[in-house]
A protein has these predicted regions:
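Polar/acidic, low-complexity leader/linker segments enriched in S/T/G and N/D
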Residues: 1-42
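Short conserved beta-strand and strand-loop elements enriched in small hydrophobics
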Residues: 9-13, 84-100
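Short amphipathic beta-strand and strand-loop transition segments with alternating hydrophobic
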Residues: 34-50, 114-123
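Oligomerization/assembly interface segments of phage tail-like spikes and tubes
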Residues: 50-71, 113, 128-142
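Edge/loop elements at the starts and ends of beta-strands within beta-rich repeat scaffolds
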Residues: 52-54, 79-83, 102-104, 126-128
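Family-specific signature for flavin-dependent thymidylate synthase
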Residues: 62-68, 76-80, 89
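Short beta-strand and beta-hairpin "edge-sheet" elements
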Residues: 96-130, 134, 138
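Intrinsically disordered, low-complexity terminal/linker regions enriched in Pro/Ser/Gly
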Residues: 143-158
């Protein structure tokens, strides 16, 4: 079984824009997030205060996938070299039918998938082989979503 690197971070990845599909997100279309981090660049003045536009950065994340058909989407995104959305949903609850009920907050990212690495692990409890997929993408947009607010962080290209 793949070790959970972040036992206190309850996050799932939905390979689309959560704001566009709303409550029609099905749990079977989500992936368990093991870890993620992103980095953006911004100029700072002598006092250390940020100013100006945010420059392109990157996002790296690792997810657990089971089966070949579940991770082909990520390779397709890399092959097509298109600006694609991914939604990180934190502390989500799902209904008995598998649809999303509620979530604490989220992060919608847009960018270009530039690298994918795989780590194979033992089988899960159902005898299915699991993969840990490490994805790196160049960011174009970050959108923070929460219970009461949506905040767009626009990234510019230099």
């Amino acid at each position: 079984m793949i070790k959970n690197h972040a036992p206190y971070l309850k996050a799932v990845l939905f390979p689309n824009n959560l704001a566009e599909v709303g409550s029609s997100v099905n749990q079977s279309n989500c992936f368990t997030v093991q870890d993620y981090h992103y980095h953006c660049f911004r100029e700072r003045d002598e006092q250390g205060n940020p100013y100006g536009n945010i420059r392109s950065g990157y996002l790296e994340f690792s997810i657990v996938v089971s089966g070949l058909d579940t991770y082909q989407h990520f390779y397709k995104c890399m092959d097509q070299n298109e600006n694609v959305p991914f939604s990180f949903i934190f502390n989500a609850s799902f209904s008995k039918t598998g649809r999303i009920n509620d979530f604490e907050d989220g992060l919608i990212t847009y960018g270009y998938v530039v690298d994918i690495q795989e780590s194979c692990d033992n089988h899960d409890n159902h005898g299915q082989e699991q993969l840990l997929l490490h994805v790196k993408m160049l960011l174009s947009n970050l959108i923070f979503i929460g219970n009461e607010q949506i905040h767009l962080l626009e990234i510019t290209k230099d």
